Swiss-Prot record:
The keyword Ribonucleoprotein applies. Transmembrane segments: none annotated. This is Large ribosomal subunit protein bL32. It comes from Corynebacterium efficiens (strain DSM 44549 / YS-314 / AJ 12310 / JCM 11189 / NBRC 100395). Keywords: Ribonucleoprotein, Ribosomal protein. Belongs to the bacterial ribosomal protein bL32 family. GO terms for cellular component: large ribosomal subunit. It comes from the Bacteria.
Length: 57
């Protein structure tokens, strides 16, 4: 684990943290029960197996 050489000020810490931004999830078009829905790629298999309710999306 990385260990800092010196203490980082509260202002610098908060400035660094504020630069972090989450990315939008890429959606895929999937046809389930004759209905086309856009869901995240990681949920495609579960949606096809019926484990996820696609009405939420």
């Amino acid at each position: 684990m990385a260990v800092p050489k010196r203490r980082m000020s509260r202002a610098n810490t908060r400035m660094r943290r504020s630069q972090w931004k989450a990315d939008n999830v890429a959606l895929q078009d999937v046809k389930i029960d004759g209905q086309t829905v856009r869901i995240p790629r990681r949920l495609v298999k579960a949606a096809q197996l019926g484990l996820v309710d696609v009405e939420q999306f």
